[in-house]
Amino acid sequence: MRFTTLSTAFLALAQNVYAFPIESDLSALDVTLSQVSDTRIKAVVKNTGAENVTFVHLNFFRDSAPVKKVSVYRENNEVVFDGIKRRFQLQGLASESLTTLEAGEVLEDEFDIATTTDLSSGGAITLRSNGLVPVVKDGAVTGYLPYSSNDLKLNIDGAKASTVTKALKPLDRRTKETCSNASRKSALEKALSNTVKLANAAATAARSGSASKFSEYFKTTSSSTRSVVAARLEAVAKEAQSASSGSTTYYCSDTLGYCETNVLAYTLPARNIIANCDIYYSYLPALAGTCHQQDQATTTLHEFTHAPGVYSPGTDDLGYGYSAATSLSSSQAVLNADSYALYANAINLGC
């Protein structure tokens, strides 16, 4: 890991503090995907429940950043996503990060998949979107709603797709310098040290610790899954050990302007780049003192798991927070970033 920045700007006391419920099966968001033109897609998100819902739209439809709104598949293999994955706070959420839909109401979002996916080879692809979106009351995440879409099959004109401007621009390496903010550098160095400790302890627990505790977070006790989880955590620990080498570049501050309100940090997985936001330092404690609470160390661990250069494939954000993460299947949990952060926190605190 290379520790750097850009010189120009481009809680409660019990184990279940953050164990939020999944909303009723009668409540859900239905997503309908359709083609507007070429690689431009329209998503219509409908609240199919009987009550109004307010949810976090970061990393979801209506987010204006180049986040992963759909998965793109070619011959059953997912095409590499070249955008950002953002981690946000669970409490004190501002209105600009939230969307409210009344019962039966819809929101529409249009986006171009070619801005975050290389489709220059053209041909047949399939789009789909599913997961869990955090529900908010009084500015705090209190539960989760499932969402799912239709499969949208497209035949892409590669020549047209290649003319679409990419969302992420190449970084100018000449603007890069050693992290010059002494306070942030010190905080991140401490977070990296804590990440090494937490990841190594969690890796040991994954290989030979409590089977029931492992199953709580990864929904299986199979030796093969335990080995994969342990290997990914060991890779995270190795990456966090050095500030001058490794597969990732870690910025003390925002590099591309994606640190909006409530965003703690983000990763560009296709480029193995991680960046912290201002509230990583002002909102998060160095280490959590309660189970499933967010902190700097597990946020850094979470971001490292997104980077395929650390361990391939990189993780996704399939379930955010304890309740959503522990509601995933085993195959989903092993690819869910927060499952690793939550498990490491649990092992550290004896949750």
From Swiss-Prot:
Glycans are attached at residues 52, 181. The active site is at residue 303. It comes from the Eukaryota. InterPro entries: Fungal_M35_metalloproteases (IPR050414), MetalloPept_cat_dom_sf (IPR024079), Peptidase_M35 (IPR001384). CDD domains: M35_deuterolysin_like (cd11008). Binds 1 zinc ion per subunit. Gene3D superfamilies: 2.60.40.2970, Collagenase (Catalytic Domain) (3.40.390.10). One of its GO terms (biological process) is proteolysis. Residues 1-19 form the signal peptide. Residues 20-174 form a propeptide. One of its GO terms (molecular function) is metal ion binding. Keywords: Cleavage on pair of basic residues, Glycoprotein, Hydrolase, Metal-binding, Metalloprotease, Protease, Signal, Zinc, Zymogen. It is an enzyme of class 3 (hydrolase). Its cofactor is Zn(2+). Its EC number is 3.4.24.39. Zn(2+) binds at residues 302, 306, 317. Pfam families: Peptidase_M35. Belongs to the peptidase M35 family. This is Penicillolysin. The lineage of its organism: Eukaryota, Fungi, Dikarya, Ascomycota, Pezizomycotina. The gene is plnC.
